[in-house]
Amino acid sequence: MIKRKILSIFLSVCLVCTILAVNGEAEAIEQKKAPQKTVKVVKFNTEMKAVWVSFLDFQNLGLTNVREKTFKKNAEIMVKDAKKNGINTIFFHVRAFDDAAYKSKVFRAMRYLKTNASYVKPATSSFSYDPLKLVVEAAHKHGVQLHAWLNPYRVGYDYFLSPKSEYSTNRIIKAVNEILTYKVDGIHFDDYFYHAKKGYYRLNSKKQYSVNPATAKKDYSPSSINKRRYVNKLIRRVNKTTQGKALFSVSPAGNVDNCMNSGVDLTTWLSNDGYVDMIMPQIYWTDNWGASGRVKMFSSRLGQFMRKNKKKIPMVIGLALYRSGEHGLGDKGWSMRGSNISGQIKSIRRHGLGGYCLFRFNNLYQGRCKKEVRNMRKISKYKKLITKISFKRR
């Protein structure tokens, strides 16, 4: 009887060992089959204090129709001036209308940098030097981050690439891949997704083309649900494309409902991994909005985005420096005082957010913005760590 018990125990132990061995081997094989994904973590140890440099700024900055030596000098002046205003990050416009502010082999040269550039031939045939390369070098030389700013779908003010078209998505990914060959710190999308006034291009040809609104096929706006579905496909692909290479951010308009209706799926982006590394809502109002001047619109919209951000995606707030001193546009705060921007920055800091971005560079030197800029500069050298932003790529 005792021998039988011993034999039974022995066989049980052998069986368990065999199962463990098989499971271990299976697990090892499974690990071989599915290699681990590298996770890149980018940390900001201080707040982002940024400015958008738009294609509309280029001429005043001395970047249009100039020789390489002059461009390089003026790009460096731009970066130094940004630093004087407490800026540590520049969002530089590299794609405004399906074009390129760099020596692209696919896209035409941006005419806001070279006014006589070919409308059909790629930028390599128009630029004798590479504007983006020089801007990146100037920024990094002075310790400023440089993010490449793209309007993904916009072809003209009235016409956009169709987000529904796979060709449109592939075309934008080509632009992103080209830009990632430069030492940019980020890829940044503006809020233009479904905003075309006249229609959307459905481009089925891979050959180079020139825009002709009169003959373009149009694919008019689908339902809001489909809009978000089409745009989400692009956002996921860009996130994957930038993995381990650059930070991917999107700057939506400041009205959550309008965003959701125009293809900006904030609910999904701010609740899930794999979409955006950082969100930058454009909250372009004061807390003295409306006929009465008593509506706290900035604070209200800021709260909406914070509540929407279930995943705690790093958030930087776009601020409307360009509206400083404005009268009669339904937002009395801009004409009432010159401390709106500095007050908004303080609010951003109180909420522990990632920082702010000013629209746009030329307004730093515009007469009616002087008071706002002066008050902003008083608090721009805020050194304390506000939030440690960790960007994990999966």
Indicate residue ranges for each PLM-predicted region:
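Polysaccharide-binding and catalytic clefts of secreted carbohydrate-active enzymes
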Residues: 81, 103, 108, 122-125, ...
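Substrate-binding cleft of secreted/luminal carbohydrate-active enzymes
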Residues: 89, 267, 271-295, 302-394
